[in-house]
Structures are given as structure tokens and as C-alpha cells.
């Protein structure tokens, strides 16, 4: 456990170093003119694309990265750190990204819950059939899917 804590502490120190380094590159009293607030059609397009990117990232990675705590914990820690920045561009952008990330995660959780409910109903329906109508291989596949969803 102590190795995990040391690694976790190092990771957090790296995030704070990155935040400090990034903040030093940008004037804290910036003009407020950054991609999320910049006027113009191309920046409006960026704003929409940025939000879509975060949602698509979660949707595409729902079977791979979301089940691995390491990248998600790091991403959430990074966004949390930047949302506390004195630089408005970092603060607003990371807060928006975090909100889109959480919204997308809720969508994935809802889909998973719906799949679990459907699977449970199908399993119960198949199990309640008479012995002559029941398909053992179907029961087995539904049970496997149930285990996979949990």
C-alpha cells in the first residue's frame, strides 16, 4: 500500500508541477481572449468540437479505459488541478471538460444500467419457460452476459 501512496503522491506533485509550469507560460492577468471565449465563427466551431471531443472520447473508450482506474484518475486529477488555476483559460476550459466528462460518464452508466435490466428480463423469461421450450445455450449466454456486465 505504501508504494501506491508514494506513486500517487508523485503523480499529484507532477500535476501541480505541470499546472505551475503552464501557469508561468501564461500571464495570470490574461486578457480573457482564449478559445472558449474568443469571438468569431472558427472559435465557435472549436467550442462545439471541444465538447463533442470529450463526449466522443468517453463513448469510444467506455469498454477499455473507463474500467482502468489509472487513466481516469489521472485525467480527473489533471482537470481538477487546472480548474483551480488562476489562469482563466485553464480554469474555464478544464471545468468545461470536467463537466462534459461527467455528463458522458453518466450516459455510459445509464446505458450499462439499461443493458443490465434488459439482460435480467431476458434471463428471467428464458428461465421461466417450460423444460421443453427452454434453450440451455441461450440461458448460458445470458448468464455470461450478466457476469460480463457486473
From Swiss-Prot:
Matching entries from Pfam families are given as:
STAG (PF08514)
Family to which the UniProt record says this protein belongs: Belongs to the SCC3 family.
* Protein name in UniProt: Putative STAG3-like protein 4
Which organism is this protein's natural source? Answer: Homo sapiens (Human)
Query: Which gene underlies this protein?
Result: STAG3L4
Amino acid at each position: 500500500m505504501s508504494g501506491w501512496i508514494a506513486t500517487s503522491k508523485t503523480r499529484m506533485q507532477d500535476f501541480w508541477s505541470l499546472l505551475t509550469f503552464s501557469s508561468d507560460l501564461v500571464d495570470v492577468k490574461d486578457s480573457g481572449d482564449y478559445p472558449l471565449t474568443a469571438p468569431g465563427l472558427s472559435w465557435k466551431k472549436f467550442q462545439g468540437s471541444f465538447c463533442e471531443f470529450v463526449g466522443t472520447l468517453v463513448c469510444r473508450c467506455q469498454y477499455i479505459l473507463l474500467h482502468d482506474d489509472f487513466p481516469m484518475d489521472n485525467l480527473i486529477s489533471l482537470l481538477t488541478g487546472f480548474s483551480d488555476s488562476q489562469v482563466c483559460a485553464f480554469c474555464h476550459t478544464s471545468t468545461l471538460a470536467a463537466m462534459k466528462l461527467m455528463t458522458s460518464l453518466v450516459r455510459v452508466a445509464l446505458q450499462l444500467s439499461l443493458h443490465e435490466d434488459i439482460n435480467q428480463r431476458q434471463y428471467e423469461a428464458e428461465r421461466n419457460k417450460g423444460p421443453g421450450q427452454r434453450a440451455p445455450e441461450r440461458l448460458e449466454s445470458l448468464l455470461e452476459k450478466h457476469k460480463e456486465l457486473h
